[in-house]
Amino acid sequence: MSQLIELGTKAEMLEQLPIIQQLYPDYTLEIYGNLLDKMIPHNYKQLVVVENGITMGLAGFWIGTKLWSGKYLEMDNVVVHEDFRSKGIGSIMTEYLNQKAIDENCNMIALDAYTTNFGAQKFYMNHGFVPKGFHFVKYLKD
């Protein structure tokens, strides 16, 4: 039976490097750790779905406040292990974080999906998300 576990410490999150590398193959333990050092103080956490010691899915999340939305939960770096896709893992994480946002009295859940990731767009729309705008990016470094 799978377990849902919230991770809040750097040590716990560093153990998730193999599944993070499915999103970011070039990440080393050092790169990942340095980023976590900057993210965790800003309320970054991770939710993992684990079964028999194997992480089947991971969803990073933050709870914050913005002028346009008020209090919100942002899903970030969501990945289902390539061996466990299309088995409901993404739905389990999304439903858990939806309830967490309700419990935390958030006004909404926000996330970004790449414009080329049509599978993710369909998945989130099937879970009640609607496209609200564009997330523009201007790269400043190569």
Show where each model-derived region lies:
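Conserved beta-strand segments that form the floor/walls of ligand-binding pockets within enzyme
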Residues: 48, 74, 79, 110, ...
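Residue-level recognition of the GNAT/N-acetyltransferase active site
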Residues: 24, 81, 85, 114
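Conserved GNAT acetyl-CoA-binding A-motif
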Residues: 94, 101-113
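Acetyl-CoA-dependent GNAT
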Residues: 3-70, 139
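Conserved active-site alpha-helix within GNAT-family acetyltransferase domains
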Residues: 91, 115-133, 138
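Short acidic/polar active-site loop segments enriched in Thr and Asp
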Residues: 45, 107, 130
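Conserved acetyl-CoA-binding loop-helix of GNAT-fold acetyltransferases
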Residues: 80, 86-99, 126
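A conserved beta-turn-beta hairpin within the catalytic core of GNAT-like acetyltransferases
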Residues: 64-75, 85, 131-132
